């Protein structure tokens, strides 16, 4: 879940009407407030044991989809297509990652609603609502956790709740915005962005003038330093200044240019739609049964959701949002690797190493003495500058090999021997 930044210039010549519109938009943004109790209610239900971890294709996913559909219906939103808020899709997944014969067909459900302002342009605000279920698809970071409920409060009941609350704000205010909003809740993300791929395939047919996509994935664990990663800022020249302009005073931003990352904005970027991706970072509960609702930073999530509300308003008032291909996406593909270091990477592109946000117990990094907060700079002789070069370096390592791994700790270089 992530992503760096280019500097930009923004030139705007505002007519009197334009100034009035901008002023009103800012006034509206300040008066409309996210309801923290709504966020909490949605997350506690979606991340409850009743939903059994919301695995795509499961009964828990169906319960979640019905809940989300009911919320959209209460708001009086329109259908995206067909006769219900649900968009069905299918894909194959291997139940045993080492055996092709275990492949099975999974039927997933996106939940999509439209605020139709009869506008020429459309913005998508989305998040995935699926999670790992009982670890049937082997995506957990906890060994031997099959059968344990992975509730996925941060990943991604948090983003889902934010989309629901934004749908409420935009549909219940007394303003007819300059754009239509599509509120999209995806399933199949944990198996490879399957649901967002389905919507991205049809979006330009149903809404040809879709100009932007905002994705929220894991926005519920704002840390004590108030660090928020915003990816995709290189996908349009207007974005670096815009995300800074509306930044809440308490938030520290890490900006990343790339339109590609391990979350649903990628599907839209690949259709030449500019994107933003918001992410509060990985943590030791990531993809574990312990990612529970009581661990969410609800005031922090409220701040982030208000931030997205302001960004979505501002983007709707832009006359044009040009699309830019980002350098990393043009030159990088996701490599295949045979080993894991057992860390949680920081996806901010710092160019001088990759920060380690978490270290998983009893995995190679932890066993070697690498700590959370270290900055990874080398695996063997392969230099690590950010998450993409980290993946390249990891792809060169074979299981059973030992390599020196270099990190910076409190400004001092340290080398550890890691057995992969």
Stretch-by-stretch model annotation:
Residues 33-63, 75-81, 95, 212, ...:
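N-terminal capping segment at the start of a domain
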Residues 113, 125-126, 130-131, 135-192, ...:
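Alpha-helical metal-binding/catalytic segments enriched in His/Glu/Asp
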Residues 118-120, 186-277, 297:
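Metal-dependent peptidase/peptidase-like ectodomains
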Residues 284-330:
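His/Asp/Glu-rich mid-to-C-terminal helical/loop segments that flank catalytic regions of hydrolases
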Residues 328-372:
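PDZ/PDZ-like groove recognition
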Residues 367-387:
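Conserved PDZ fold ligand-binding element
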């Amino acid at each position: 879940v992530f992503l760096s930044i280019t500097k930009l210039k923004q030139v705007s010549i505002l007519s009197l009407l334009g100034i009035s519109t901008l002023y009103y938009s800012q006034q509206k943004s300040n008066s409309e407030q996210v309801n923290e109790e709504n966020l909490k209610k949605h997350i506690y239900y979606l991340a409850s044991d009743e939903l059994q971890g919301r695995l795509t294709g499961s009964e828990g996913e169906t319960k979640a989809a019905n809940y989300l559909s009911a919320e959209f219906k209460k708001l009086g939103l329109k259908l995206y297509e067909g006769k219900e808020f649900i968009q069905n899709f299918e894909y194959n997944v291997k139940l045993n990652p080492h055996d092709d014969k275990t492949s099975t067909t999974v039927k997933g459900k996106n939940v999509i609603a439209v605020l139709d302002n009869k506008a020429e342009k459309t913005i998508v605000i989305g998040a995935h609502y699926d999670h790992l279920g009982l670890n049937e698809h082997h995506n957990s970071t906890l060994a031997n956790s099959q059968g344990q409920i992975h509730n996925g409060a941060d990943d991604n009941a948090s983003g889902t709740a934010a989309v629901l609350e934004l749908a409420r704000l935009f549909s219940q205010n007394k303003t007819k915005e300059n754009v239509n909003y599509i509120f999209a809740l995806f399933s199949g993300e944990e198996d490879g962005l399957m649901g967002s791929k389905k919507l991205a395939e049809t979006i330009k047919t149903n809404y040809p003038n879709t100009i932007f996509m905002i994705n929220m994935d894991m926005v519920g664990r704002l840390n004590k330093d108030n660090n928020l990663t915003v990816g995709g800022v290189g996908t349009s020249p207007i974005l670096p200044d815009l995300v800074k302009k509306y930044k809440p005073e308490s938030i520290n931003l890490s900006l990343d240019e790339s339109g590609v990352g391990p979350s649903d904005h990628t599907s839209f970027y690949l259709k030449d739609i500019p994107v933003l991706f918001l992410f509060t970072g990985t943590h030791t509960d990531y993809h574990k049964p312990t990612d529970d609702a009581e661990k969410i930073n609800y005031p922090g999530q409220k701040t982030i959701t208000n931030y997205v509300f302001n960004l979505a308003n501002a983007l709707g008032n832009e006359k044009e949002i040009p699309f830019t291909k980002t350098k990393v996406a043009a030159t990088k593909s996701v490599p295949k690797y045979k080993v894991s270091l057992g860390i949680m990477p920081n996806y901010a592109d710092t160019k001088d190493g990759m920060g380690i946000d978490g270290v998983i117990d009893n995995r190679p990094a932890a066993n070697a003495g690498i700590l959370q907060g270290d900055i990874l700079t080398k695996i063997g002789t392969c230099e690590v500058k950010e998450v993409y070069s980290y993946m390249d370096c990891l792809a060169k390592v074979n299981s059973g090999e030992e390599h020196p791994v270099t990190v910076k700790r409190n400004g001092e270089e340290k080398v550890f021997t890691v057995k992969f």
